Amino acid sequence: MKNCISRRSFLKAAGILGAAGALAACGGSSSTSTAASSTASSAAASAAGTGASIKLWTYPIGGWGNDDTVQNLISSFNAKYPDIKVTVEYLDYTNGDDQVNTAIEGGSAPDLVMEGPERLVANWGAKGVMAPLNDLWTDDAKKDIYASVESACHNEKGDYYEYPLCMTAHCMAVNMTKVKEVGADKYIDTDKHTWSTEGFLNTVDALYKGGYENVAAIYCSGQGGDQGTRAIINNMYGGTFTDAAHTKYTADSAENIKAIQALYDAKGVNFDPSINGGEEITLFRNGTLQMAFCWNIAQQLNSDNNDAGLTNSGDEIFPMAFPTESGDPKLCGGIWGFGIFDNGDEAKIEAAKTFIDFIAADPDQVGASVLASTYFPVRESVGDIYAGNDIMSEYTKFMSYLGDYYQITPGWATARTEWWNMLQRVGTGEPVEQAVATFVQNANAAATAEA
């Protein structure tokens, strides 16, 4: 079995042993504000006139997980449309899906939810619990929103279940101070933020030999941050997670098997079933780990414990594309926007569409809505909203590395669960070929059932 960072060690390193229960918290917080309905349609106008009330549940998408930020956005909406009461609940990625699924089963789903196509289209949309948003997708919207984003927001029948606001490229990060300390910065193209697979493995080896026992973690306690573990494995030798048509899962390819085995064999890389992506970030920031596979611009901008771009102790954090043999990294993209649960109340559905139309499409508002996310606009018309911000300007380089948005493949929810279970089995010593064969069998069975 590969070594792992124990749960107790994580809690001690994070400095929160006395608050361990917080890691198991299962509730979101909520807030209420008054906002108004749009006159985008007669139904919406009717909703406004009757004082329709809607519930928004949002995952922690940059500033959209911060109540002050969200209330400011709702206040802008309220200034134009003052008659709808909006209740906001903030979800997390540990328990949020369970909360939503429980609400769906109990007939109390929110009217609005903010997340990505893998949930809104491939999961809840496929289950028939979402209201189509086809009327919001006007010809002008389709021309303005990037085609790669638009294609992820509808199903194979052409029904749209997401209206997007922002996007980013997920990447990884290294403690550049420590990398330079062990002389491994020679393996990194600091202008392009790229490196070869050989260079990555050499960097891991140099850090390990330099006295850093825990260089990186293949975290697998759950699905949180799993885009990072998928990306490191797929990129190393040119593997894919699904086929190009998004009909089946392909983790059992020779390229993926080679990558998983290389990571398992690398000293300093630990398959850790006790942590998820968010906890990996904490360990990276406090110096326990020297690399993080769960990273994006929101993490790079985080200044909770030090200035943006620095670890807690002041070391330089350098964002990196995942290593490749080809020199052509394929990063997982994050697309976030809004979906509407069909709760059978047309007035609420139209009021929710009004909110979406204002926040994500109004030319006088959409820029501020994107800025609140700390991500990038999905609309060409929004332009450069980060002019003069050196960190954001540098991070735009990663957008050119965006790969296929495969998260809309049928069976996605099952595949995510099977993925971290597969990594756990590898960590206990199960042969990689056997572990990925089980993953593919179970994930593709789910894909077939949902197709």
Residue ranges and their predicted role:
Residues 43-48, 116-171, 198-201, 314-323, ...:
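Hinge/lid segment of periplasmic solute-binding proteins
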